[in-house]
């Protein structure tokens, strides 16, 4: 097909889509031009059905450094492993796409988005999400889209579509919402303690933009799209299901209601193993060249159906319990939260620590404070260096679920959970001026049965308070679930692992008693209604307040003092023009200051803020006083205790006609003989010598910065 171009506008910027010219061997490909941002989106699917029990979809978002006119760092000078931004954006695009494939589809699909040109004012993330949907829509891949995304901010009570970075700095909402023309199926948000009503309004505002982009894609599909292939779906064989249920179904159903997670899974696994072993004894034969041989394909199909049937029995029972009996596998009511237990100050040498336990999910939180030069450097497409002073890292070791497994670099899930917790707590942190520290929170998941990301938020909040970080308010998180049964539905508070796996929604809400600070929603169905979302938000608010009440019994106020092992920081402000006086040629002066003041750490910002760090407050104060003395500026009319440094002689070198006096380190002025005393004098011989301390007044500072002093006006 020949190249075709489709144009519209998005948030006041031109949006152009080109198809049919680049990457023609992919199933679907589109070039997205948004402002000066250019993204190539491609979609490819394997023709052969995969032998997996899940849908193998891989979404990749890759930022090329050349897109911003930059050469990559590092020894090899080329792009390496995905950055955190790339990983999170890949997940962001994956989440609204995945529900729009048939449940039994098992072909491997890869959607790749490559940022070729980067415009800071035109979001490459939104362009990539749109491009991913278009690439799938115009391909033969059986995708039930289209979907689109919208970035929403709110400034002075007014919603803004696709806000710029400057607008986001003053916005109280940072929301990305995605979905189809009919429903929302993904939400990712950070907010400054906004109400549930405001958040819902923001989501609906974003959905209006989504509807327009979906209509735009329908136009492209009609003009360029190809016929979809009929998917080869993994479907349930009812006869085999009935046979499996007759053999061990009742035992499996009973095991679902065991309260203890480990016991429940152990019993379920044992029953499944017994069923598999039973059906493994069955063989199938076929005739080849007059001989009876084993039919391996038919045997493999049988065992696949047995495993699918076992999973279906568990799924049906979990959903039946909730929708019909209104009780959950562990016996809780639909809005009931698991038992809570917490403590602080577990680790004596850390700067702050806490433990949060909710049912069989447990998180250990640790806070570390450092100097601002320990901020994380973000090496992205921005032209200026971007740093981050608050970091939250989430670790999920295999032992937390009683398993062995891989240890190493964090995966996509760990990075995503850490980012959600970071976003939730960031909203309540003090400003850099109020608390001039780099802050790192680490959440070690020590037990897990669902909602570990929300346990991370709770334990992080308590650990920050225990560390003496003056947060605006405590933050708690809760994960909500949903079971749809036709037109009827059940909303669950504080979902556990089995409910997450078998349910239709994972809706995570974090916030303070006054409002939401973070929101994340993923669903497995094609979308949910506004009414369901509204009800889930209100149920989450009640659950959040319950958890906050518990946390308040453990630690109700931020500690007034930092740990004895935490570094102390003092901030002073100096005239930016005086920074060179503190640093000196080749760093000579600042190096000497550090050596003379017990190896303090000193960070100087371009705006004149100076951060001094040491474990001993006395050295902080001494260093601050010394730096302030270096950069002090004389003021006309001020009195100073000055030290005579030089004598001013007459032209014959016989009589003292004045003195030079240092009013503070680095600044001296002239006291002429006429300004020495009220009575007229011919010479200062015998009246003053080098080293004398005299009281002087600044009477004039000329345009060259020279200071005239008067002794007589100070008397």
From Swiss-Prot:
InterPro entries: ExoRNase_PH_dom1, ExoRNase_PH_dom2, ExoRNase_PH_dom2_sf, KH_dom, KH_dom_type_1, KH_dom_type_1_sf, NA-bd_OB-fold, PNPase. It is found in: Cytoplasm. It catalyses: RNA(n+1) + phosphate = RNA(n) + a ribonucleoside 5'-diphosphate. Residues 637-712 form the S1 motif domain. Mg(2+) binds at residues 500, 506. CDD domains: KH-I_PNPase, RNase_PH_PNPase_1, RNase_PH_PNPase_2. GO terms for biological process: mRNA catabolic process; RNA processing. Its EC number is 2.7.7.8. Keywords: Cytoplasm, Magnesium, Metal-binding, Nucleotidyltransferase, RNA-binding, Transferase. GO terms for molecular function: 3'-5'-RNA exonuclease activity; magnesium ion binding; polyribonucleotide nucleotidyltransferase activity; RNA binding. Its cofactor is Mg(2+). Gene3D superfamilies: GHMP Kinase, N-terminal domain (3.30.230.70), K Homology domain, type 1 (3.30.1370.10), Nucleic acid-binding proteins (2.40.50.140). It holds the Pfam family RNase_PH_C. It comes from the Bacteria. One of its GO terms (cellular component) is cytosol. Residues 567-634 form the KH domain. Belongs to the polyribonucleotide nucleotidyltransferase family. Involved in mRNA degradation. Catalyzes the phosphorolysis of single-stranded polyribonucleotides processively in the 3'- to 5'-direction. This is Polyribonucleotide nucleotidyltransferase. The lineage of its organism: Bacteria, Bacillati, Mycoplasmatota, Mollicutes, Acholeplasmatales. The gene is pnp.
């Amino acid at each position: 097909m020949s190249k075709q171009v489709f144009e519209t506008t998005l948030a006041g910027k031109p949006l152009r889509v080109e198809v049919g010219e680049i990457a023609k061997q992919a199933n679907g490909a589109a070039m997205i031009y948004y402002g000066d941002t250019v993204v190539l989106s491609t979609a490819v699917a394997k023709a052969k059905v995969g032998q997996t029990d899940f849908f193998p979809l891989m979404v990749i978002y890759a930022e090329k450094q050349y897109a911003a006119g930059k050469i990559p760092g590092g020894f090899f000078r080329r792009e390496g492993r995905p950055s955190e931004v790339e990983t999170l954006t890949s997940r962001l695009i994956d989440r609204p796409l995945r529900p729009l494939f048939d449940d039994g589809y098992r072909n491997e699909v890869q959607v790749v988005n490559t940022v070729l040109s980067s415009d800071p004012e035109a979001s490459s993330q939104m362009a990539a999400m749109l491009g991913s949907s278009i690439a799938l829509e115009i391909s033969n891949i059986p995708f039930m889209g289209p979907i689109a995304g919208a970035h929403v901010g709110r400034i002075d009570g007014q919603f803004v579509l696709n806000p710029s970075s400057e607008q986001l700095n003053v916005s109280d909402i940072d929301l990305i919402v995605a979905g189809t023309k009919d429903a929302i199926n993904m939400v990712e948000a950070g907010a400054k303690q906004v109400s549930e009503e405001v958040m819902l309004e923001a989501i609906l505002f974003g959905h209006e933009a989504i509807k327009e982009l979906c209509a735009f894609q329908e136009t492209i599909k009609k003009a360029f799209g190809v016929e979809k292939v009929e998917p080869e779906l993994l479907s349930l064989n009812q006869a085999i299901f009935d046979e499996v249920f007759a053999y061990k179904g009742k035992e499996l159903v009973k095991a679902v209601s065991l309260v203890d997670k480990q016991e429940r899974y152990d019993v379920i696994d044992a029953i499944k193993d017994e069923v598999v072993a039973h059906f493994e004894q069955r063989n199938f034969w076929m005739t080849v060249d007059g001989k009876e041989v084993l039919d391996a394909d038919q045997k493999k199909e049988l065992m696949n159906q047995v495993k699918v049937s076992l999973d279906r029995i568990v799924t049906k029972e979990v959903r039946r319990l909730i929708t019909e009996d209104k009780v959950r596998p562990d016996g809780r009511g639909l809005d009931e939260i698991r038992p809570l237990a917490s403590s602080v100050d577990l680790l004596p040498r850390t700067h702050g620590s806490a433990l949060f336990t909710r049912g069989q999910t447990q998180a250990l939180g640790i806070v570390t404070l450092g100097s601002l030069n320990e901020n994380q450097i973000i090496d992205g497409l921005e032209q200026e260096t971007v740093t981050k002073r608050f970091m939250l890292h989430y670790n999920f070791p295999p032992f937390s679920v009683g398993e062995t497994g891989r240890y190493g670099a964090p995966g996509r899930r760990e990075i995503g959970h850490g980012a959600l917790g970071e976003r939730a707590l960031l909203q309540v942190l003090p400003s850099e001026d109020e608390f001039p520290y780099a802050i790192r929170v680490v959440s070690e998941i020590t037990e897990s049965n669902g909602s570990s990301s929300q346990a991370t938020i709770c334990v992080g909040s308590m650990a920050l308070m225990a560390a003496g970080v003056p947060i605006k308010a405590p933050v708690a998180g809760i994960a909500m679930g949903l079971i749809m049964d036709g037109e009827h539905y059940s909303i669950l508070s504080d979902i556990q692992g089995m409910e997450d796996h078998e349910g239709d929604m994972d809706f995570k809400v974090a916030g303070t008693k006054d409002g939401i600070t973070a929101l994340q929603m993923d669903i497995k169905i094609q979308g949910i209604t506004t009414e369901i979302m509204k009800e889930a938000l209100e149920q989450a608010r009640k659950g959040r307040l319950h958890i906050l009440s518990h946390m308040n019994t453990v630690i109700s106020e931020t500690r007034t003092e930092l740990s004895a092992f935490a570094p102390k920081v003092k901030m002073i402000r100096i005239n930016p023009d005086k920074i060179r006086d503190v640093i000196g040629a080749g760093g000579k002066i600042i190096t000497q200051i550090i050596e003379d003041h017990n190896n303090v750490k000193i960070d100087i910002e371009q705006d004149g803020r100076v951060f001094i760090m040491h474990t001993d407050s006395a050295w902080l104060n001494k260093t601050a006083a010394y730096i302030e003395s270096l950069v002090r500026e004389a003021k006309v009319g001020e009195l100073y205790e000055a030290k005579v440094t030089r004598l001013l002689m007459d032209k014959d070198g016989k009589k003292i006609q004045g003195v030079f006096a240092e009013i503070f380190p680095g600044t001296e002025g002239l006291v002429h003989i006429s300004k020495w005393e009220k009575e007229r004098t011919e010479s200062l011989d015998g009246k003053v010598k080098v080293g004398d301390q005299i009281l002087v007044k600044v009477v004039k500072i000329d345009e060259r910065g020279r200071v005239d002093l008067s002794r007589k006006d100070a008397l």
